[in-house]
Amino acid sequence: MTNTKYYPEVSSNADFAAIEREILKFWQDNNIFQKSIDDRNGESEFIFYDGPPFANGLPHYGHLLTGFIKDVYARYQTVKGKKVERRFGWDCHGLPAEMQSEKELGISGRLAITNFGIEKFNSHCRASVMKYASDWEEYVTRQARWVDFKNSYKTMDKNFMESVIWAFKELYNKGLLYESMRVMPYSWACETPLSNFETRLDNSYRERADKAVTVSFVLNEIPAINGMTSRESGTTSSGDYKEYRILAWTTTPWTLPSNLALAVGSDIDYASIPKEDICYIIAASSVSKYAKELGLSGEENFEIIKGSALQGLSYKPLFDYFANHPNSFKIFAGDFVVEGDGTGIVHMAPGFGEDDQILCESKGISLVCPVDNSGKFTKEIPDLEGVQVFDANDKIIIKLKEQGNWLKTEQYIHNYPHCWRTDTPLIYKAVPSWYVKVTQFKDRMVELNQQINWIPFHVKDNLFGKWLENARDWSISRNRFWGTPLPVWKSDDPKYPRIDVYGSIEELEKDFGVKVTDLHRPFIDELARPNPNDPTGKSTMRRIEDVFDCWFESGSMPYGQAHYPFENKKWFEDHFPADFIVEYSAQTRGWFYTLMVLSTALFDRPPFLNCICHGVILDATGQKLSKRLNNYADPLELFDKYGSDALRVTMLSSNVVKGQELLIDKDGKMVFDTLRLFIKPIWNAYHFFTMYANADSLKGELNFASQNVLDIYILSKLKIAVNKIEESLDNFDTQTAYHAVSEFFEVLNNWYIRRSRARFWKSEKDADKQNAYNTLYSCLETMAIAMSALVPMISEAIYLGLCHKRPDVIARKDLSLDEAISGNSHEIATALSVPRNDGSISVHLCNYPNLSSFEINHELVATMDNVLDICSNSLFIRSTENIRVRQPLATITIISKHNDKLKSFEDLIKDEINVKSVIYRDDLENYASKKLSINFPMLGKRLPAKMKEIIAASKKGEWEAIGGGLAICDETLNSDEYKLVLEPHVHIKGAASFENNSSLLILDLELTAELIEEGYARDIVRFIQQARKDADFSITDRILIEIISEFDLSKIIDNYGDFIKEQTLGEFSKNFTPDYVSKVELENHQIQLKVKRS
């Protein structure tokens, strides 16, 4: 009679990468992703915003990490019954695209691009920006992330761009935009300013060595000392000085040709230091740093001048480039001047310093900026014209020495901002730009931020919250080419000023009388019209050349993707704000921030309600992953080797989801460990079920009605795990969710299945056996659904393998996993399309398990967990003492207050840890004592002054446990400030505590001859079972056994022969031709085993 097999033949040594490829094909062939959206009616939606990446480079591990997190919560919310649209998006504009195009075209700089032709350059950008789009789709699909590529949005699409210019005009109409010439971080390599938050991206600050120079400025007036000039004060040196010089220190010598003022601190004490016939003025606190240069011994006393007394003095210009600049070359007080580095005097070049500009403009000094867009000096500095500013430092220092203004040059190592695209050092430079008045509504952003749930929580009030509190106005214009143009037209004649701002294509077409098919440069630049405010009709309205900062476009994603407000108005209003977004932590200065600015300014709402800030992935040595360093493997290689589920678990079960770093090795050992320790146990449980169910021709059913104590226990643990996964994912905590899965399968495999083997092995197909199959089936199917977001492909494979409820599949007697999920034949495809009872053909179309009708037996769980604790501790003692598990021991003594409950599991304990008897006691004090362990970091924060006293008392045992706390030194310690550890008395061997240090077990480690003999018998059983497996016998095959040994086993066979035969389905025999022969070793003696199917 042929066995009916209801389940696929599942290999215990599965090729998970191959399984995943089959699952991906099943999803594609059956359009499962789209079904997961269509099956939800939309009454309840989970709104998710997908931050747009650039497609001009391949995805890296950081992208995959973000993608895994996005996919987990999208899948989870789907099985929770919500509709989750997942529209992909592409960031297309900005420096990344332009820099790549310049490289590919072999040109560099604004002038070269203009000569090449803006239209041709932007056409190249348009083509190259999607260069890796197909690769992105391959990576994203292979990582089992479901997204809608077909309807993806692009920031370069006309509709998206129109929404961006709408937002600009809205801000303009609200009075939240202004144009200004301000000092900003400036990338001379990209020839464009950067916003202040761009300098905080991706560790843009790094260590750099610069030449710092100390320069002397010659005063035109004699400073007052104690309200008098030195001559009036009667000091001995009065009148002896040829010059008074004030010393300033700077790390940017190249800005000195643009010096227009000096700043001092009003309340700072300055010393007047004579050297020959010159008196130098410097902050008193800095004198010692210049002892050598000023010829000081360290014993001198100096006249002190308050900074306020220096205010208003004038000085001679260092150079004559701007010598006639109005209101310049004076000393002013600045609240930003502090003592420390330098001289306590700050040189002011308002074209290259933000504080400089603010102070100088307040004193009527207009800025000068003799540096061009490429960071080179202009003709205003004729002897340095065309020299790059950093290359000019040495030339300027030489000139200072020649003039007699130089005092000192030193190497200064400091953290300095670099361009996030070119890695070149930035300069600070005055440039014209359009700004969003963020400072006008930053307090409102701080308020709205309180409505957002941040993960980790501290981001809310620290990393992001502090950034919002200190927000500055945002420069949103860039003098570049490939981007959404600022919709601003100005009169080209200042006599007839006029500014027009446009917020739609319709407005443009109405005013300019042309059909607008492309908003990009140069087409938009060609739109011009007569200035309505010019009665002469000679001036023209022309567009300013700037384009938007691409971060403005990214921040416009919520409405830009919907072409709001021109289309989809209702859709946008129903899908704003987002329920969830995720990116890495630096986006608190990037995308998260720009979303917040625009959402607050335009809608007075937070842009998202839940946000995960994950950490970064580094190599095994803590270095950034880099192609140049060749320190990481192509993710596709890992997928092909271990599968993407394993990488997903590796990443999302680590601290990287809590904003910390994850170090990943190039060879993928960490991913292999995840496969071995997390994925394989899940698969092993599934393999066990299918193997034995097929052998018995039995089907499992979803059934929670068994009264078997092990079944009730594991089903209770199942519900606990399902609830914990749900609770964790509701709280955006994948770490805890993965731990719940791992913990459950640890108990399922190493406790439930192992303790239930006899029920699966026995030949009788009774109710107890069916209950065992139903229970294991229920665990597997329920967990497949519960963990489907966490391990989407392995869950799907298991779910499809358990498809025996479908009539078409039941008819197949030899259905394999590959056949079940490949859809290679009409019959199989039909089978996979037959709905389950809940209408689901895929695990990802199911509803999250609802186990409300099953009550957890908490008392049983607590007791069984104690039993498990007893057994695991006993096995650990065996391992420590080098006593193998198959070697029986005489007794275990259990000392506990819950012996009555434990006694009902005595046979289980004896069998599991292989002891002959259990002794119960309750006199714990005779065997162990409690030792107090202090949590020093925790308690030290609360009671730092009493720590020594508490430590001494704890060592003396001068404490008392009271209620939920502990009394010591007139203080009551909280539960998280201490732990009571149960320590066995020194003379007791083989002991361990359990039940939270409230109980003790003691194993009798003495081995008698009878015990040793029985241990050998169990070893022989193991040898035979391994031979059966190696011979590829079925688990139901009966066999013949012959044992040939130099070791006398006759007594063992006589005493334990029946036990050996029962355990191995065998009979002892001789003179047969074996199917398999193995050689093993027992106590250093060789044994030959022969086995044959009988």
Swiss-Prot record:
Organism domain of life: Bacteria
GO BP: isoleucyl-tRNA aminoacylation
Keywords from the UniProt entry: Aminoacyl-tRNA synthetase, ATP-binding, Cytoplasm, Ligase, Metal-binding, Nucleotide-binding, Protein biosynthesis, Zinc
GO cellular component, one term: cytoplasm
EC number annotated for this UniProt entry: 6.1.1.5
Gene3D superfamilies tied to this protein: HUPs, Isoleucyl-tRNA Synthetase, Domain 1
Motif 'KMSKS' region, residue numbers: 624-628
Example of a GO MF term: isoleucine-tRNA ligase activity
InterPro entries: aa-tRNA-synth_I_CS, aa-tRNA-synth_Ia, Anticodon_Ile_ABEc, Ile-tRNA-ligase, Ile-tRNA-ligase_type2, M/V/L/I-tRNA-synth_anticd-bd, Rossmann-like_a/b/a_fold, tRNAsynth_Ia_anticodon-bd
UniProt short sequence motif 'HIGH' region, positions renumbered to this chain: 53-63
Main EC class the enzyme belongs to: ligase
Listed transmembrane segments: none
Residues the entry annotates as binding ATP: 627
Disulfide partners: none
PROSITE patterns (UniProt xref): AA_TRNA_LIGASE_I (PS00178)
Substrates-to-products reaction catalysed: tRNA(Ile) + L-isoleucine + ATP = L-isoleucyl-tRNA(Ile) + AMP + diphosphate
Cofactor: Zn(2+)
Subcellular location(s) of the protein: Cytoplasm
Function: Catalyzes the attachment of isoleucine to tRNA(Ile). As IleRS can inadvertently accommodate and process structurally similar amino acids such as valine, to avoid such errors it has two additional distinct tRNA(Ile)-dependent editing activities. One activity is designated as 'pretransfer' editing and involves the hydrolysis of activated Val-AMP. The other activity is designated 'posttransfer' editing and involves deacylation of mischarged Val-tRNA(Ile).
Family: Belongs to the class-I aminoacyl-tRNA synthetase family. IleS type 2 subfamily.
Free-text note on domains in this protein's UniProt record: IleRS has two distinct active sites: one for aminoacylation and one for editing. The misactivated valine is translocated from the active site to the editing site, which sterically excludes the correctly activated isoleucine. The single editing site contains two valyl binding pockets, one specific for each substrate (Val-AMP or Val-tRNA(Ile)).
Assembly with partners or alone: Monomer.
UniProt-recorded name of the protein: Isoleucine--tRNA ligase
Organism: Rickettsia felis (strain ATCC VR-1525 / URRWXCal2) (Rickettsia azadi)
Gene: ileS
